[in-house]
Design a protein with these regions (language model features):
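Short polar catalytic/cofactor-binding loops
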Residues: 14-21
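CN hydrolase (nitrilase-like) catalytic-core segments centered on the catalytic cysteine
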Residues: 76, 81-94, 161-251
């Protein structure tokens, strides 16, 4: 049976950067294979985690003698990105390729998620940085983009924990937030996923999360734990569906979560104005554009 109109098949993947490969090219091909396999299995969009590409670090070190963030960024730009653009050109398919250090024209380094859709490329930089990311500079733009009839945004790890950022998306009709993440503790996994669920309620949208797992020869991502997760709005239009789908939490290897999105429940929810729904308050009623003082009693 043909799926209903305006559906989207998601493949959420954790990723273990400790790949047994011999070169930067082999590492890139392994990532390409994971994405193409997801597409071949029916996914319209594949989501990989934050710092997927920091597993390049030991290969960059052997090749150029050092592996600073800038070195990794240059290796990705010169060796990985051209190969990715050559191979990932499939129409009607999209992927968020995790994140990688990326050089700015001014010489800074940003934590960047590359996105491919229908063979075209765009990116999202991380906007809020952890204490461990002192070598990066924060991004300054949150991009909205569309694919398959759905409006999307990529919000990276700590950014999902900042409700002030989700405030910027009120009244935007965002349908899906994609959150690549990396954390070394179970508490970090819980924090990211609980906030992802909250963003789903606040904005009335779907939120998908993919965490990094495993070990890597890297000071930045030496140990990782995580899972794949998906959250829906807690509204009547979604009552026949689970509000959360989560894989098991793992410390290594790849876990998989396949999810089908349908546009109809989102559209129905947005028409149900008599239902209590924080997503329908808009910026003015939510107290963003009107002054609500805080008083101490």
């Amino acid at each position: 049976m043909k799926p209903p109109a305006e559906t989207l098949e998601l493949a959420l993947r954790t990723f273990d950067p400790g790949l047994n490969v011999a070169s930067i090219r082999e590492y890139t091909l392994a990532v390409i294979q994971m994405i193409e396999a997801g597409w071949d299995e029916g996914a319209d969009l594949v989501l990989l985690p934050e710092f997927t590409w920091m597993g390049l670090e030991p290969h960059v070190l052997r090749q150029v003698g050092s592996a600073t963030l800038a070195d990794v960024a240059q290796a990705f730009d010169s060796e990985c990105l051209p190969l990715l653009k050559e191979r990932l050109q499939r129409q009607g398919r999209a992927a968020v390729l995790g994140t990688v250090p990326s050089l700015t024209p001014e010489g800074g380094v940003r934590n960047r998620a590359w996105i491919v859709r229908d063979g075209g490329w765009l990116f999202q930089d991380k906007l809020h940085l952890t204490p461990w990311e002192s070598g990066f500079e924060a991004g300054d733009v949150l991009r909205l983009w569309s694919f398959g009839g759905f409006r999307m945004a990529v919000i990276i790890c700590l950014d999902i924990e900042v409700p002030e950022l989700s405030v910027r998306l009120r009244d935007s009709d965002v349908d899906l937030i994609l959150c690549p993440s990396a954390t070394e503790t179970l508490r970090g996994v819980e924090r990211v996923n609980r906030c992802a669920s909250a963003r789903s309620v606040e904005l009335g949208c779907h939120v998908a999360v993919s965490h990094l797992t495993g070990r890597a020869e890297s000071e930045l991502i030496d140990e990782n734990i995580g899972r794949a997760a998906f959250y829906r709005p807690s509204q009547a239009a979604f009552k026949a569906l689970p509000f959360a789908e989560e894989s098991e939490t793992v410390t290594s290897g790849v876990t998989r979560l396949e999810v089908r999105l349908e546009k109809r429940p989102l559209d129905l929810m947005r028409r149900m104005t008599a239902e209590t729904n924080p997503a329908l308050l808009g910026k003015e009623l939510a107290g963003i554009q009107r002054h609500i003082p805080v008083e101490c009693a």
